[in-house]
């Protein structure tokens, strides 16, 4: 009897681990591609081609809370315009703090961490987002969102 129970328990554990693996794979498969095109005129030469684009999310109805990083991508470019593709996880709303419901509206925006002039610091002499033109809002439902740079 003990052997039968032990065999059933081991079989159950093996089956459960297979089910968990399938859930993990399906969650990965459900990630959404979000494309952002960075456009503008660069007055300076791009000496450092490597940078990082970060996608943030913040609840629409909550004021004065820090945004949550939901995806990031490293990129390389020598010229403008350029495009980056984020892999937005299917469960990205569960990452947002403070916690929100799946039905809550979320505002998405992008930021750059890019020392484009290669002087060792990210500052106003680099290619930066042009907030005077528009806030870098990202619409995850559209084919491509455009962000202005200067």
Where are these regions (language model features)?
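Acidic, glycine-anchored loop motifs typical of Ca2+
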Residues: 118-123
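Extracellular beta-sheet/turn segments enriched in Thr/Pro/Gly and aliphatic residues
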Residues: 133-150
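Sec-dependent signal peptide recognition
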Residues: 2-8
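C-terminal motif of bacterial Sec signal peptides marking the signal peptidase cleavage site
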Residues: 14-17
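A short, amphipathic beta-strand motif
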Residues: 32-42
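Tryptophan-paired
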Residues: 64-102
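Bacterial signal peptide processing site
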Residues: 19-21
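A short beta-turn/strand-edge loop motif at beta-sheet boundaries
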Residues: 42-49, 63-64, 95-96
């Amino acid at each position: 009897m003990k052997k039968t129970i032990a065999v059933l328990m081991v079989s159950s554990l093996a089956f459960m681990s297979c089910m968990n693996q399938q859930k993990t794979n399906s969650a990965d498969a459900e990630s959404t591609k979000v494309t952002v095109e960075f456009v503008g005129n660069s007055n300076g030469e791009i000496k450092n081609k490597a940078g990082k684009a970060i996608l943030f999310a913040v609840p629409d109805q909550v004021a004065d809370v820090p945004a949550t990083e939901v995806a990031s991508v490293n990129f390389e470019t020598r010229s403008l315009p350029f495009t980056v593709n984020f892999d937005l996880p299917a469960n990205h709303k569960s990452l947002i703090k403070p916690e929100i419901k799946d039905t809550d509206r979320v505002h998405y925006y992008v930021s750059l961490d890019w020392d484009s002039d290669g002087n060792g610091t990210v500052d106003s002499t680099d290619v930066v987002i042009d907030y005077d033109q528009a806030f870098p809002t990202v619409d995850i439902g559209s084919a491509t969102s455009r962000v202005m740079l200067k």
